[in-house]
Amino acid sequence: MTEKNNMYKPSLHFTPSYGWMNDPNGLVYHDGIYELYYQHNPRGIDWNCMTWGHARGTDLLHWEDLGDVLEPDENGLMFSGCAIRNDRGLLGLPEDALLFFYTAAGHSSRESKGKPYTIRLAYSTDGGNTLIKKDGKLANGEVIETLAAENRDPKVFWHEESGAYILVLWIENNDFGIWRSEDLEQFTMTQRVTLESGYECPDLFRLPVISAKEGGRETGEEKWVFWTAHGYYYVGSFDGYEFHQEQERRCASQMGPDVVLPYAAQTFSGPEKVLSVSWLRTKCVGGRTTGMMSIPKEFSLIRNKDGYILRQKFPASVIEAFAQTENGILEGACYRKFRNQNPQPFVPEPEIMGMHDEDMEWEIRLLSKETCLLKLECQRDTKKLFFTRGIVTDSCDLGCELENLELIYDHGILELLGNEGTFYLAVDFPELRAEAVDRIEMSENLKEYT
């Protein structure tokens, strides 16, 4: 759990005790535990000196910060990678060992001057507490051959149908590579694929297709999704050797008032559901930490007339934690789920009238001790969403009608899911980082539901 003695830290979005953080790394589930590693600069609040930090949790909401586990060396700073459980007992290690594939960023430090980025291996035999670096089979200790000066960000998973481990990697520009291995020692490249606007931090996973008309039941259909850092996703097929894109790229996140906040999402290895965490590019408040992790999301696909659309939802354990509270407020953070019963303009109460009220379809107010910290207003005609804090108002384009929405607000961080999870928006209000919510109000045309 985040430290309580730092008033500028969120309650439920993980941040380290101190320093800069970015990409989630090595997400793996084992023995009822979620391990969360992450890019960390323990020396300051700006990007530098990349190490792997480590946190652990059991409910996808509360995390224990366990410090740094993978330090820079002569091969470079420790850039992004992944983790898997050694289920097949390979590499002379026990089945319960955790295996980590990571990027050593050559020429990123004085010690690694003149070296390229290389993909390397580490392991843990104590449940992920201690990571031990291990040379790969190539002459210089690499796991796979370097193809470009800064190729990076390996993601590894087992593909049952073809009986091999798959490694995906960003190579350069919009190019990604796919490798296969049966023993995690010898890897064979099977595809170099170009993805429109794709850049770094790849992931490749299979998702169930959910019926949009039958209460969210699975249809029995499955599709593969290739994921890249900006939240661009590409739906297609994968046979264990090659990925074939079948529809145009889409983006999983909506543009906020000034930025698409989520970046470099990664899925957990191990759990039955496909669970993803992204880095939220939040600002430093109070001089202690920069950046935080999103609340995890469970992924599936919905198929409609436009094709396959990513569906995101907050995990059941997250919702249950809020449901067990008296009023849906947990450690100063809140969760609510609304349905828009009447998409018509409403007449606001006189004391909360604002400059846009005559055009508003609905509004939500987050309060602390009778003070409105944040007001959300949806404009009827333009489908803009306005965010008001005191006399400051920002807005962003929704691009669609929101028939229903879920929100989690946590000390200045707002995550919104809409339209059964096909809409996702995250916004940072750093000036509210020290503020806890104790009550929520809404316009009459919004109805809470579970």
Which ranges hold each PLM region?
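A generic local secondary-structure boundary/capping motif
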Residues: 111, 265-266
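Beta-rich accessory regions
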Residues: 239-258, 266-450
